[in-house]
A protein has these predicted regions:
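Short hydrophobic/aromatic beta-strand or adjacent loop that forms the aromatic wall/cage
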Residues: 27-31, 98-102, 159
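A generic structural micro-feature
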Residues: 24-26, 94-99, 118-123
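Conserved hydrophobic "DFG−1" position in protein kinase catalytic cores
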Residues: 34, 42, 104-105, 128
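Nudix hydrolase/Nudix homology domain
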Residues: 49, 120-168
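Acidic, metal-coordinating catalytic segment for phosphate/diphosphate chemistry
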Residues: 1-31
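Active-site-adjacent beta-strand/loop module that shapes the phosphate/pyrophosphate-binding cleft
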Residues: 91-114, 127
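A short coil-to-beta-strand element that immediately follows conserved catalytic motifs
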Residues: 79-87
Length: 168
């Protein structure tokens, strides 16, 4: 059964230059856009100098909202309430599809951070950043086109998410 698109939810498609024209697997993930005043909650990797909207892979049997709650607690130490899915992004790279759901969310409390080994190695930590600064950082996605396709794709995705969802 096909899910109905929520009213007010936007959808965009990003196709990488290495996309092979069809995909044989889909990775689903959920991310949270958490805004307080004029600041947004981001995850920052101190060792790689990389910013991202917090979230991660949806586990088997897990609802999208449960994924948002779990991932934000693990990565940021915040308990959040996902309000609504504001954006769906379909990304295509190689022979894979990445389906990302962005939920507008609010903070409800604190949790214990539980980072993966890779996140620990990269020095991941939560940071609050003015929205305009986050948009500025992510807007520079094209400067990584020749040197870092992973970061280019990540920053293009996050820039697209913020500019589609936040109407400032």
């Amino acid at each position: 059964m096909k899910k109905k698109k929520q009213i007010g939810q936007k959808s965009i498609k990003i196709v990488g230059s290495n996309y092979l024209g069809e995909y044989n697997s889909t990775r689903k993930s959920c991310r949270a856009i958490v805004i307080e005043k004029d600041n947004i909650l981001l995850s920052y990797e101190t060792k790689t100098d990389t910013w991202m909207i917090p979230g991660g892979g949806q586990e088997k049997g897990e609802t999208e909202k449960d994924c948002v709650i779990r991932e934000l607690a693990e990565e940021t130490g915040y308990l959040v309430e996902p309000i609504r899915c504001a954006l769906t992004i379909n990304e295509y790279y190689g022979n894979e599809r990445f389906l990302l759901k962005y939920y507008l969310s609010t903070i409800k409390g604190k949790a214990e951070v539980n980072l993966t080994e890779k996140e620990k190695q990269n020095g991941m930590e939560p940071r609050w950043l003015p929205i305009k600064d986050a948009i500025s950082i992510f807007s520079e996605h094209q400067k990584y086109a020749e040197t870092d396709e992973m970061r280019r794709g990540l920053y293009l995705r996050e820039y697209s998410a913020l500019t589609k969802v936040i109407s400032k």
